[in-house]
């Protein structure tokens, strides 16, 4: 009798709160270090023979990242899932990978024009396109509290990104505007990615590791063609030959990305893309603090007020925001 009760007792992993806590902590730890490595690679000055240069190979960086992500997902499937079948349509993985890598390349490229805290707060808008496209395409319905929380996030991000006109038109202002456009493109593609992922989990019950593997394999294929066609990969190899110390940071960057993506796709499968986008946003405040402390990026009082609004909205969402009432896949 006692043995029967013990056998029927659910495992700790079946507890939704435990599962969510593991996903959140995994995302937080992995992407905190990921963000530091990203800024170290893309914003550092590299000096060779008295000449300074910047890292300008965002596409190749994402290409390497996708290879490591796919390899890691394959290992997870091999050791933990065995012969479990995946019935998801291949074209859905292809569409998801195109929007996913487009968002990533745009976001990484934006770092060449804006500092990391600006990029992070800009990407904090991610729940907005995920919600909008979910409502318009998948016919999701959210409670009013959810929309209020999103409004607070939008207002906070707008305050953070706003810069008063100092009365002169400089190239810096133009460059900042281009960075904003890259962030906007990245957010739109994030929303499309969320819609496709929601459809896959609802229609095909796609597993986290299979989603991670196939999305990254498609991304590797597309990016491999892109970097070979443009010749960027050869310029990247020449750059690493001049600065071999960067290879260590790139490998660490790829490993932290793979670990972080494991928790990201677990969150998508178990809790949905909107919850995942909110999780990835809440950890950004600590990423910003880390960037400010380590790299000396200055944040104004208005930007701090915007930051407070962003995370006030996220806090209210955690307390009052409910799951969508209806989803049509």
From Swiss-Prot:
GO terms for molecular function: UDP-galactose transmembrane transporter activity; UDP-glucose transmembrane transporter activity. It is a multi-pass membrane protein. Pfam families: UAA. It is found in: Endoplasmic reticulum membrane. One of its GO terms (cellular component) is Golgi membrane. Coiled coil: none annotated. The keyword Endoplasmic reticulum applies. The chain crosses the membrane at residues 21-41, 60-80, 91-111, 142-162, 175-195, 220-240, 250-270, 292-312. Keywords: Endoplasmic reticulum, Membrane, Sugar transport, Transmembrane, Transmembrane helix, Transport. One of its GO terms (biological process) is UDP-galactose transmembrane transport. A motif (Di-lysine motif) lies at residues 325-329. Gene3D superfamilies: 1.10.3730.20. InterPro entries: SCL35B1-4/HUT1. The di-lysine motif confers endoplasmic reticulum localization for type I membrane proteins. Probable sugar transporter. Belongs to the nucleotide-sugar transporter family. SLC35B subfamily. This is Solute carrier family 35 member B1.
